[in-house]
UniProtKB/Swiss-Prot annotation:
One of its GO terms (cellular component) is cytoplasm. The lineage of its organism: Bacteria, Bacillati, Actinomycetota, Actinomycetes, Mycobacteriales. One of its GO terms (molecular function) is RNA binding. It holds the Pfam family Ribosomal_S9. InterPro entries: Ribosomal_Su5_D2-typ_SF, Ribosomal_uS9, Ribosomal_uS9_bac/plastid, Ribosomal_uS9_CS, Ribsml_uS5_D2-typ_fold_subgr. Keywords: Ribonucleoprotein, Ribosomal protein. This is Small ribosomal subunit protein uS9. GO terms for biological process: translation. Gene3D superfamilies: 3.30.230.10.
Amino acid sequence: MTETTPEVEVAVEAEVTYSESFVFERPIQTVGRRKEAVVRVRLVPGSGKFDLNGRSLEAYFPNKVHQQLIKAPLVTVDRLESYDIFALLHGGGPSGQAGALRLGIARALIVANPEDRPALKKACFLTRDPRATERKKYGLKKARKAPQYSKR
């Protein structure tokens, strides 16, 4: 009562290739954090425009060092003029927000093109910087600074 069915081998090659013409169904959304700053990043195919809380990159970050820091992941993978970046930044100061934005952009680039991961990881753009302000302790003036000691 056992029937033998012929086994047929079917070779299916489903290779996914990522290229510049990758079409997004919706914008890529990621989050970057640094110190007290939190940044929500939306990556959309475009011409390299930055929109940070409704302002341009140069208006929001007038410091050239911060601008270079933010553009670094895009320059590393040669996609500076491939995407438009829309970001909502809040909390922290300019340095923390710039670091958070860099992390958010790097994470979004990986979602858009996973082949970029080794280059971004080697440049340490995917590492969340854990350093934050140490809390003030009672009995001390600051986190570690003790009040002046008088022997007599």
